[in-house]
C-alpha cells in the first residue's frame, strides 16, 4: 500500500514529465530500434543499407527521424514496432515503480531543518546597499539614505575596535546634511571642523572638558513646557549621585523645590538671570542664612494658581528641620552650577537647536571619557535638542528641511534620554537618523533597562566590529541565524534480524 501511494504521489507530481519522456522514446527511439532489429532488409528503399551492422543502422535511423517515422505503418515493420513498444513500456513501468520506491517526497525545508542563513554572495547585498553613496558601513558598502525602512545604525565594538576611525570619521566626508557628533576626546573636532567650515557649515561646540571654549547652553531658556521643566529637574536630581541621601523623600522634595524656583525665575526674571546658577544662589542664600522664609516670600509674589506656587506647596508644609534637609539636598545637586566655568557655559544660549534642521550645521559634543561628572548635562542637552527637532519637523510638514544625522559615540555616557525608544521609532519620517556607537549591548541594557530591545529593534542596520562581551557575541550570532550543514538520521528495528541504520546528509 505504501508503494502504491508513492507511485500515485510520483505520478501526480511528475505525470507530464513521465508521459513526455515515454512519448519521445515511443516516437523516435522505438521506431529506430525496431528498424535496426530487422536490419532494414525487409524494406525496399534505396536509403537503407542492409549491410550495416545493428549499431550502424540504429544510429542512422535515429539521426533521420522523419525517414524512420515514414515506416511506422509499413505492414512488415509495424508488428516489430508494436512488440518493441510493448516491451519498452513494461520496462518503463518497472523503472517508474523503482523510482517510486526510492522516491522521498521533497519538503519545502529539506536540507534547511536547522536554518538556511548564509553570507551574501555575488553582490547580493547591493539589493539593499549602494556602492557609491549614503552612510558608510564598509568599503564600497553604503546604506542609502532613501532606503525603505529606517537608516538608524547600531555599531558595536570593543575598545580599540576602530569605531571612530572606520565608521564615524569616514562618514564626515559624505556631507549628507546636518550632523551631531559626540566627541569624547575632542579629536573629531580637531580633525574635521575645518572641513565642515570649508564646506559652508555652521560649527557649534558643547565643550564640557574645556567650558571656556564652548558655546553657551542654558537649558532653562529652552524649557517651554511643564514637560521640559520636568526633564530638567528629574535629570539634575536623579541623574547624579552626590551621596547626599538614600531616602527618596528628600530627592522628591528637592525636585519640587527646583521646579518652583525655575518657574519663578521664568516668570519674574529676564533671560540673563534665568539660569540654574541663579537657582543655586537662591538655595545657598536660604540655607546659609537659616532664613527659610526667603523662598516663601519670593513665591508669594506670584498668583496662588501659578505653577511655581503649586510645586512649592508640599515643600512649604515641611517642618523647619525637614525644610533645612531639603535645601541641603538641592544645594548639593546644584553645586556644579556654582563653578564659574559651568555657570558661564549655562548662562546663555548660542546653539539654536531648530537651526540644525533648517540649515547645514554640525554640532560637536565634547565630554570627558574618564569621569561622568557632567553627564547629566549631556542628558538634558540631547533631550532638548531631539525634542525641538521633532517639534520643528512636526510644524514643517512632518520633516526637517535638512536631514540630520546623529553619530553618538560612547552613547552610554549620555545617560537615559526620556522616551528615546519612541523617538528612534519615529525618526525616519522626520529625516532624522541615529547612529548609536557602543562597546557592548550590556551598556545599552544598563541605561535603558526596560526599552533597550525596542531601541535595538528600531536600528535596521547593525555593524559588529567585535566585542569580548559574551551577551553581545551571542546576540549577534543568533541574529545572523543558522545553517544546516549536515543531518544524521538513525532508525532501529527490533525482533528477528534486529539492526540499525544510519543516514548522513
State what each model feature region is:
Residues 1-161, 165-166, 212:
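Basic- and hydrophobic-enriched, low-structure N-terminal and domain-boundary segments
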Residues 1-2, 9, 13, 180, ...:
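Hydrophobic, aliphatic-enriched repeat segments that assemble into extended interaction scaffolds
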Residues 30-38, 107-109, 144, 149-432, ...:
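P-loop NTPase motor domains
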Residues 68, 132, 287-288, 493-497:
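Intrinsically disordered, low-complexity segments enriched in small/polar residues
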Residues 83, 104-105, 113, 124, ...:
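Glutamate identity and glutamate-enriched acidic tracts
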Residues 91, 109, 249-256, 260-263, ...:
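P-loop NTPase motor core of the ASCE superfamily
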Residues 438:
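H-loop/switch region of ABC-family ATPase nucleotide-binding domains
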Amino acid at each position: 500500500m505504501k508503494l502504491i501511494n508513492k507511485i500515485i504521489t510520483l505520478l501526480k507530481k511528475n505525470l507530464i514529465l513521465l508521459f513526455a519522456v515515454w512519448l519521445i522514446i515511443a516516437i523516435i527511439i522505438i521506431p529506430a530500434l525496431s528498424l535496426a532489429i530487422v536490419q532494414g532488409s525487409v524494406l525496399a528503399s534505396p536509403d537503407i543499407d542492409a549491410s550495416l551492422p545493428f549499431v550502424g543502422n540504429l544510429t542512422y535511423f535515429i539521426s533521420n527521424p522523419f525517414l524512420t517515422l515514414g515506416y511506422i505503418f509499413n505492414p512488415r515493420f509495424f508488428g516489430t514496432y508494436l512488440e518493441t513498444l510493448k516491451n519498452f513500456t513494461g520496462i518503463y513501468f518497472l523503472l517508474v515503480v523503482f523510482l517510486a520506491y526510492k522516491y522521498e517526497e521533497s519538503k519545502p525545508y529539506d536540507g534547511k531543518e536547522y536554518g538556511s542563513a548564509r553570507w551574501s554572495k555575488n553582490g547580493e547585498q547591493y539589493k539593499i546597499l549602494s556602492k557609491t553613496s549614503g552612510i558608510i558601513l564598509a568599503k564600497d558598502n553604503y546604506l542609502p539614505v532613501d532606503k525603505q525602512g529606517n537608516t538608524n545604525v547600531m555599531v558595536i565594538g570593543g575598545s580599540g575596535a576602530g569605531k571612530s576611525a572606520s565608521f564615524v570619521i569616514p562618514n564626515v566626508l559624505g556631507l549628507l546634511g546636518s550632523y551631531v557628533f559626540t566627541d569624547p576626546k575632542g579629536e573629531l573636532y580637531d580633525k574635521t571642523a575645518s572641513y565642515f567650515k570649508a564646506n559652508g557649515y555652521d560649527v557649534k561646540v558643547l565643550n564640557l572638558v574645556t567650558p571656556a571654549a564652548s558655546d553657551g547652553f542654558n537649558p532653562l531658556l529652552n524649557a517651554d513646557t511643564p514637560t521640559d521643566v520636568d526633564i530638567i529637574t528629574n535629570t539634575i536630581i536623579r541623574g547624579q549621585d552626590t551621596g547626599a541621601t538614600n531616602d527618596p523623600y528628600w530627592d522628591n522634595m528637592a525636585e519640587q523645590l527646583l521646579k518652583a524656583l525655575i518657574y519663578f525665575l521664568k516668570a519674574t526674571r529676564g533671560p540673563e538671570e534665568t539660569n540654574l546658577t541663579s537657582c543655586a544662589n537662591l538655595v545657598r542664600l536660604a540655607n546659609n542664612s537659616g532664613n527659610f522664609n526667603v523662598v516663601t516670600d519670593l513665591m508669594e509674589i506670584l498668583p496662588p494658581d501659578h505653577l511655581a506656587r503649586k510645586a512649592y506647596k508640599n515643600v512649604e508644609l515641611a517642618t523647619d528641620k525637614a525644610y533645612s534637609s531639603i535645601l541641603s539636598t538641592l544645594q548639593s545637586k546644584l553645586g556644579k552650577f556654582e563653578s564659574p566655568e559651568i555657570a558661564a557655559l549655562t548662562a546663555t544660549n548660542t546653539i539654536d537647536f531648530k537651526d540644525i534642521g533648517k540649515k547645514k550645521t554640525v554640532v560637536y559634543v565634547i565630554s570627558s571619557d574618564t569621569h561622568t561628572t557632567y553627564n547629566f548635562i549631556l542628558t538634558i542637552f540631547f533631550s532638548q535638542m531631539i525634542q525641538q527637532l521633532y517639534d520643528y519637523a512636526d510644524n514643517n510638514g512632518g520633516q526637517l528641511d535638512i536631514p540630520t544625522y546623529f553619530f553618538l559615540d560612547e552613547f552610554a555616557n549620555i545617560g537615559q534620554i526620556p522616551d528615546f525608544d519612541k523617538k528612534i521609532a519615529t525618526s525616519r519620517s522626520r529625516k532624522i537618523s541615529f547612529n548609536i556607537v557602543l562597546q557592548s549591548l550590556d551598556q545599552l541594557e544598563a541605561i535603558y533597562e526596560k526599552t533597550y530591545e525596542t531601541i535595538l529593534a528600531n536600528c535596521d542596520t547593525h555593524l559588529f566590529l567585535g566585542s569580548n562581551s559574551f551577551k553581545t557575541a551571542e546576540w549577534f550570532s543568533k541574529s545572523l541565524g543558522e545553517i544546516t550543514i549536515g543531518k544524521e538520521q538513525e532508525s532501529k528495528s527490533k525482533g528477528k534480524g534486529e539492526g540499525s541504520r544510519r543516514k548522513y546528509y
